[in-house]
Curated annotation (Swiss-Prot):
Residues 344-358 have a biased composition (Pro residues). Residues 369-605 form the TLDc domain. InterPro entries: TLDc_dom. The keyword Cytoplasm applies. This is Restriction of telomere capping protein 5. The keyword Cytoplasm applies. SMART domains: TLDc (SM00584). It is found in: Cytoplasm. Residues 167-198, 331-358 are annotated as: Disordered. May be involved in a process influencing telomere capping. One of its GO terms (cellular component) is cytoplasm.
Amino acid sequence: MGGALSTDDPEQRASSVEELNQRLAHRFAAKCFEPLELTHLKENFFSRALDQHGIRYWNEEILSEFLGIPDGAGSAAAATSDGSLDAGPVIFRMVSYLGAFPFQNTMAPTVLTFESMVKVVVLLTERYGKVLKRGKKDRIKLLFGSLADVGRRDIITQLKEATEDSLESIGPFDPKSASPSTHNTGFLVDQPLNDEDEEDDDDLAIAALESLDAIEVFKHDQRIDKTVYESKISLTTFRRLLTLLLVTAPLRPLGRVSKFTTGLSKPSLDAVHEQVDSILAALEPGEASDGIGYKSFSKLVSTSLPYLFDPLTPLFEHLLFSKNLDLSRKRDSQTTNGLTNKPVPTPPSTPPISPPLSPVISTGGFDSRILNPAVLSHLSFFVSTNVHIPNIFRNRTHLHPVFSSTEHGESLTSFSHHVMTWQAPSILLVRGAVVSESSEEQLTTIGAYLPQPWKQTSSYSSRRSSEVPDPSTLPCLFELSPVHTVLQGSPSFSSLKPNMPVSHFSTKTGIAIGCVIPPSSRKSLGSDLHPKPAGGGSLLIDSALENATFIVSNGLNGPGVFLPPGISPVLSSTSLTASVASMSSSNQNITKSISIYNLEVWGIIPSTSLATQLDGSGSPIEKRDAISLQRAQWDFEAREAERRQAINMKVGGGEADVPTGRALLEMAGIIGDSYYSGHHRH
């Protein structure tokens, strides 16, 4: 086989590539799909496919209509007047590129045949990990190549030309042929001009071909494109994709896409556009006009938007369920004809009923002044709340309203009562205006994900220690607007000194996230008591909950809880140290003083099924959820308040003994500042 594949005959090599493409698609299908899923995929594809010369294929209109994506034409026309959701051309461009994998050099853009669709569904859903050697790293390369449109000739025109040329050149379909030829000259940018990153790209394709004994034909002439690193993604293309991803982020498996893409009000669209602008603002300034390069795209996605493309999974998994397919009719027919009496498992004719997967905002709380669907979608792109299913829209996370400065008052006593009694992870959100010399007000939204409960200062000595960083157990500090910024938690934060907790609460100095806490003593006065910034970033909020200071550092403040921006905690220890050292050389600090308008804390309640814990014998442990624990704590505090009121404060009965009695109670920790939750005054 090797001799045949290494032939110098261009036509035979092209035929070999077509054969390999067919075999690879079959391997993808066998490895990544259940038989029933493949049956539904075939039904969906062939029942809608166009036919030309015996070739069954989809065009852009069919794809957009089936997925429910607005594309400005057909029944999936733009749902918004400004066309910001018209992502049909972008998605079709992506699938036309990915359908040629791993032969983008000679086959992209490819006609969207069934074999191409099989590869597309694998690469755009969670199944990609079964076929890509380096998982997310390889997928980011493929996604960038599928989106890059700057440096290529007009993509839409080329897609149409490629489809027409391919269908016209193949002639009548020969039933004896293993597969029709859909060969074309490929994207101009994919023609090899240099060998930069050749080894990585070759490995990516070889990983897909090594089991097919097809390495020689690949190495001979079909190298993956190298000039993809010289091309760029236009801002318009990325903006449309971001808008679609933000709007469809809550999409559940088999859910209706039109529910999220139609009927959007202007305020809802404005909120989406604010988040899109924030993410785009995180790119290098020059890329706004020239396009987004591979390095910037890869850095942005891998370090601060790791779950950005998660909405594509439920979107393309629609192809794996057909409403028209009902195998129960076939079973009934077989039973009636006496062919078999053996029960045959049948797929459901309607989508199975499953609990809502979107984060549920608990009823009976406050109306948020910060959280809205767009902000929630933005958070889902980088906040991980579960090790097995990181995405908050997929792991059945519930968000519980814990504290609102608007609802509960701008008081640390009230904050303590509501937040310090919450024994579960939480998200802190702050909305306000950046204080500057300019008269123009600039709104900002910052926050922190805290995977551990808020605790008293003295409780931070017992912190988690783990060798393998799990995103759901690492804190993160972030800015949602006006510039998307994520400071990931350092995987070594558990080994930091006890005076460097993730979060710190004090009735005297306020709230501190990611700071060094000076030791308290009788000699410490004034500014000596205030927390100091540390690591890649910190957040300080004064005791009146009126002002905040947000600091982003490239290493000037030494080690800390958070890494500098643009660094991922999943790097090896050597790479992590080198990255932090290179960032530290810039010695840049960005400090924002913020006048707080709203401060909110949202508790995270994981899915009951995902939160189940087992004891030593393997039996499930009965757990009380955070809401019940908080109510129990409040009941305890109420009883303690009644008990304290019943104590005779006069001790000896005289007025002069009142201070003595109060001093004794303070030393016992029953009243006074030492009791962290205090007694809240309303």
